[in-house]
Regions:
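Alpha-helix N-cap and loop-to-helix initiation/capping positions
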Residues: 23, 27, 98-99
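Short, contiguous strand/loop micro-motifs
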Residues: 18-23, 45-46, 66-69
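Active-site-proximal beta-alpha core segment in soluble small-molecule metabolic enzymes
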Residues: 49-102
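N-terminal glycine-rich anion-binding loops that anchor highly charged ligand groups
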Residues: 3-8, 27-60, 76
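Generic N-terminal amphipathic, Lys/Arg-enriched alpha-helix
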Residues: 4-23
């Protein structure tokens, strides 16, 4: 598959208000397939770093397409874990120290 020409990408986002994120779903799925192929050669699983994704829909796609080797989400803060829990995610790891005021 060839990447989309920039003109096609531009035409698809001209009708929406910016700033906005544009995700090529085919490219995302190919990246998930490649990543899963690498980790299947070993005895490891993978947790998505939410700090790198920043899209609930993309996280859902990655977890669904990644199969049993994609085990959940690594959140940067407890507040983000709570936000994602409210959206139905149930395998959450808060990776950084959390300090509450008071």
């Amino acid at each position: 598959m060839h990447p989309r020409p920039w003109s096609a990408v531009r035409a698809s986002i001209d009708r929406i208000s910016l700033p906005a994120a544009f995700v090529d779903r085919q490219a995302l799925r190919r990246n998930v397939e490649r990543t899963v192929a690498r980790i299947e050669r070993s005895d490891v699983s993978m947790r998505i770093a939410t700090k790198s994704i920043r899209s609930v829909e993309a996280m859902r796609t990655i977890l669904a397409d990644g199969g049993p080797r994609m085990v959940g989400l690594m959140c940067y803060a407890a507040s983000e874990a709570a936000f994602l829990s409210d959206r139905g995610f149930d395998d959450l790891l808060v990776a950084y120290p959390t300090v509450q005021p008071g």
